[in-house]
A protein has these predicted regions:
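A transmembrane-helix-recognition feature enriched in membrane-embedded lipid enzymes
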Residues: 2-41, 65, 86-95
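A cross-family acyltransferase "interaction/gating" segment
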Residues: 5-6, 135-174
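Short, basic, glycine/proline-bearing loop/turn elements
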Residues: 26-28, 94-100, 126-131
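Catalytic core of membrane glycerolipid acyltransferases/transacylases, capturing the structured
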Residues: 45-104, 112
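Residue-level preference for the first positions of well-ordered beta-strands
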Residues: 50-52, 120-126, 155
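Hydrophobic/aromatic ligand-binding patch that stacks against planar heteroaromatic rings
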Residues: 66, 91, 115, 145-150
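Internal catalytic-core helix/loop-beta-alpha segment
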Residues: 102, 109-110, 114-136, 144
């Protein structure tokens, strides 16, 4: 199967705000019709940004559920040094993201992230540094670093069960 690597992923940037807003509603539609999702603590989210949402990363589908839970446009930070299968290549292209090389952090990643926070927007990050599937990895330090520099609170979030979210959805079972 064809994959897209660091050259493609490293060139991506977040899409315009209105586009991410539309995609948030697509996530709401998909999440509410194809999967059974329970959200707890949504009332604890800040009423307006900026803030950094830090979430575990057990599934390739986590960004969809992340968007579903927050229900506002999110600027994701995502690894550019990975391979993405053709089946999933549309997602980073359509949504866009702030690319980060997990082996060497570039100043442009920090600048883009701080720009998001200065505009009062939401920054989404998976501190694990990649999909870990069933174990929490030791978090990277970037979440706290960006929160401090951007003077934005960190909102913790957890997703579980996303890897099984689509089971039975084609049969009408949610």
């Amino acid at each position: 199967m064809k994959t897209f690597g660091p050259e493609f992923l490293g060139s991506l940037t977040p899409r315009p705000y209105y586009w991410r807003y539309i995609l948030t509603y697509v996530a709401l539609l998909m999440g509410s019709t194809l999967a059974k999702i329970k959200i707890k603590g949504r009332a604890n989210l800040p009423k307006k940004g900026p803030y950094v949402v830090a979430c575990n990363h057990f599934s390739d589908y986590d960004p969809l559920f992340f968007s579903y839970a927050i229900r506002q446009p999110i600027n994701f930070i995502a690894a550019s040094d990975q391979e993405v299968d053709l089946v999933f290549a549309w997602a980073p292209y359509i949504y866009g993201w702030i690319p980060v090389d997990r082996k060497r952090l570039s100043p442009s990643t920090i600048k883009r992230s701080l720009s998001v926070l200065k505009k009062g927007e939401i920054l989404g990050i998976f501190p694990d540094g990649g999909v870990s599937y069933n174990l929490l990895n030791k978090p990277k330090k970037g979440t706290v670093f960006l929160s401090n520099l951007g003077k934005a609170p960190i909102v913790p979030m957890a997703i579980y069960g996303a890897e099984r979210a689509w089971e039975g959805s084609l049969k009408g079972v949610r």
